[in-house]
Amino acid sequence: MKANKKQTVIIVTAYGEDNYFQKRYEDVVGIYTSVKNAIKGAKADGLTNSQIDYLNRINAFYMLDKALNEGRSGESAQVEYEEETDARRKPCTSSYMFQSYNLN
């Protein structure tokens, strides 16, 4: 799957470092710091009702743990996580992971 063919929404579960994520993912449709913000922002970004309904059902930590444990990627949860550290960022933990959802 080519990056320019997918539609991605990233939900940051702890810290909203918008600039970092926007630079890293060129195909990002929206970056939201919570599911509630994702639904509100998704409407503003023109996502379809079915995509918004999908976002509304997400339990971020459950989906993240399940997808990581199953080693899945693709339709339901394309999950990526950062283990990098720098002056601004703590090492990745369950409270600092984020999700990238392919909504196509």
Where is each model-derived feature located?
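Short, low-complexity interaction segments enriched in Ser/Thr/Pro/Gly
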Residues: 2-3, 33, 85-87
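Short aromatic-glycine-(Arg/Gly/Cys) micro-motifs in beta-strand/loop hairpins
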Residues: 2-28, 45
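GIY-YIG-like beta-to-alpha core
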Residues: 28-40, 44
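A residue-level detector for conformationally permissive "hinge/kink" positions
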Residues: 22, 38, 63-66
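Short, mixed-charge low-complexity intrinsically disordered segments
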Residues: 44-104
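N-terminal cationic leader/targeting segments used for protein routing and processing
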Residues: 3-7, 20, 37, 91, ...
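Ordered hydrophobic segments in well-structured contexts
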Residues: 7-13, 27-33, 76-78, 95-100
